[in-house]
Structure formats: structure tokens, C-alpha cells
């Protein structure tokens, strides 16, 4: 095995189990330095210069202290592309990629049925790193109007950098989902709001609790649907005719979120399972009768 890989692996073994240390070592080399796994196996990794060694040791030092890889290298993969990531925003998850796929497919089908006219209007409520809004803007070839909200100025700064990085046309606004109602309607409302209850903290990994923004993760035990009530009201008031709302949810409450959408007048409400077999998404539509 390559000498640099072994150096990284040995450093990470001081904190992680063998299997996780190995996976992280491969990911660090590929995502942090552009070294593919095949090059490691073939022992064709070029020697690191002084600057690369310094950066590597800085990253390893942070990871040995518990910093997640994505924060240590400053970026995370999402749908095969890199997005700037720091502790002001959540690290994008694979499940959220599925939410983007769902929304992108619906948007294209909606436009095809619509047959032209005004651009599609998309709202990403609680954008974080901006990955959902940016990917949807790119899927629509920057021909849709995409607006993205977050209550955190720090998160919005990261999201704007990511939009510039990817050449995506997104309008970012500081908005509180719980206390704001826009004046105009949207064809698609998408959101991945906080949905983990305080009681679930005990089951979570230390690196998530210690480094990821709690405001983007947790909701009170006595009000787990806090953000979904606001989103349901938003959809009731501002979802365009034939439009759709799609949200990521806690698997324990997906059915309740779908019922909440139905109670607010939406049609074709349903839950959708993720790649791990969990009920992870809830959708609803504003059907014209």
C-alpha cells in the first residue's frame, strides 16, 4: 500500500476503528488532494511537496480531534460535485440527493406539461450550503427562478460562494421560515428543515453533535413538526396551482407530515422512502379541481 496512504491511515487509527480509518484515508486523498483509489492501490501516488505535507498534517490534526472530514478539507461531495462546507452549514447527506432528484424530475415533467410560459418558480426554504437550490437551478439550466432562504447570515455566505462556484443563478434571502410569508407564489417548494428531536441526541455520533450547527438539526421534543407546520401553511397560502411541496423528514414523523399537508388542503400527499429503506420524504400538490 502506498506510503502516503499508510501515513494517513496510521494517524487516523489513533481515533477511528480500522475500517473507518481506511475509508476516511481513501476519501481524504481523493476529495482533499485529487488522488484516486486506483492510484493508491497501484502505488502511483506522486510525492507530496512541502505545502501539501503541511496541509495534510493540518487536516489530520483536525480529524484526530474529531473534526469531520468535510469540515477539515472545507468541502463535501453532493451529487458528484464539491460544495464548500464549514461548521456554519450541515454536511450534505446522500438522502438529500434523492430529494433533489425527486424535485428535478417533477420540475422537468411540470414544464413539459405546462408547455412554456413564465419560468418555473422554485423556493428552497432553509438552504444551508445551498446544495438543493444550486442543483435545481443547474438542472433547469438556470432558466428557472430559484429563491433560497436561510435565517443564518453565515450559512447564506457559504451558499452564495457555492452558487458562484457552480455558476448557478439563485436569489438568496435572509428569511425565517417560522415568521415570514412571501407575497408571490411558487411552483415548487422544497425544504430540508431541522427534524431531529432532542431525545435523539443520545444516539448521534459525537462529531455531529460537536461540530454541525444545532440550529439546523434539532427541534423540541414537544413540537417535532415545528417547521412542517410553517411549511404546510406556506404551501397552503403560496403554492401555485398544480405546484408541489417536497420535504425531507424524520422517518418517525413522515406520515404525520403527509397528513399535515392533507389537512392544509393539499392533494396527492404521500411519503417516499430513501435509499436506506426509511420513510424520508413527504410531498403534496395543489391540484386544481
Which residues make up each language-model segment?
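Mobile active-site "lid"/loop adjacent to the S-adenosyl-L-methionine
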Residues: 195-227
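Residue-level signal for inorganic ion chemistry
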Residues: 28, 66, 96, 132, ...
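Conserved AdoMet
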Residues: 30-106
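Conserved SAM/SAH cofactor-binding pocket of Class I
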Residues: 98-203, 230
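Non-catalytic accessory regions of SAM-dependent methyltransferases
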Residues: 1-41, 45-48
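Active-site beta-alpha loop architecture of Rossmann-like, nucleotide-cofactor-dependent enzymes
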Residues: 70, 196-199, 252
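Conserved hydrophobic residues forming the short capping helix/wall of the S-adenosyl-L-methionine
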Residues: 12, 107, 163, 235, ...
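Conserved Class I SAM-dependent methyltransferase catalytic core
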Residues: 221-286
Amino acid at each position: 500500500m502506498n506510503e502516503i496512504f499508510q501515513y494517513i491511515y496510521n494517524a487516523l487509527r489513533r481515533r477511528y476503528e480500522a475500517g473507518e480509518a481506511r475509508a476516511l484515508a481513501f476519501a481524504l486523498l481523493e476529495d482533499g488532494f485529487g488522488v484516486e483509489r486506483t492510484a493508491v492501490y497501484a502505488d502511483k501516488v506522486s510525492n507530496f511537496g512541502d505545502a501539501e505535507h503541511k496541509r495534510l498534517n493540518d487536516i489530520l490534526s483536525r480529524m484526530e480531534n474529531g473534526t469531520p472530514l468535510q469540515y477539515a478539507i472545507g468541502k463535501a461531495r453532493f451529487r458528484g460535485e464539491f460544495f464548500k462546507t464549514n461548521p456554519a452549514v450541515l454536511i450534505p447527506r446522500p438522502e438529500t440527493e434523492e430529494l433533489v432528484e425527486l424535485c428535478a424530475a417533477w420540475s422537468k415533467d411540470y414544464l413539459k406539461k405546462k408547455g412554456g410560459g413564465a419560468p418555473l418558480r422554485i423556493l428552497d426554504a432553509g438552504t444551508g450550503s445551498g446544495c438543493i437550490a444550486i442543483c435545481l437551478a443547474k438542472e433547469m439550466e438556470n432558466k428557472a427562478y430559484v429563491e433560497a432562504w436561510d435565517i443564518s447570515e453565515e450559512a447564506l455566505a457559504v451558499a452564495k460562494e457555492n452558487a458562484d462556484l457552480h455558476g448557478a443563478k439563485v436569489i438568496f434571502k435572509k428569511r425565517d421560515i417560522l415568521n415570514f410569508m412571501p407575497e408571490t407564489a411558487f411552483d415548487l417548494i422544497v425544504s430540508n428543515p431541522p427534524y431531529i428531536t432532542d431525545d435523539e441526541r443520545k444516539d448521534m455520533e459525537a462529531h455531529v453533535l460537536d461540530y454541525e450547527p444545532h440550529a439546523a438539526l434539532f427541534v423540541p421534543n414537544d413540537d417535532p413538526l415545528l417547521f412542517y407546520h410553517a411549511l404546510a401553511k406556506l404551501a397552503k397560502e403560496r403554492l401555485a396551482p398544480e405546484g408541489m411541496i417536497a420535504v425531507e423528514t424524520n422517518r418517525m414523523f413522515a406520515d404525520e407530515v403527509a397528513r399535515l399537508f392533507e389537512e392544509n388542503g393539499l392533494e396527492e400527499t404521500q411519503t417516499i422512502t430513501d435509499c436506506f429503506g426509511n420513510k424520508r420524504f413527504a410531498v403534496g400538490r395543489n391540484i386544481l379541481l
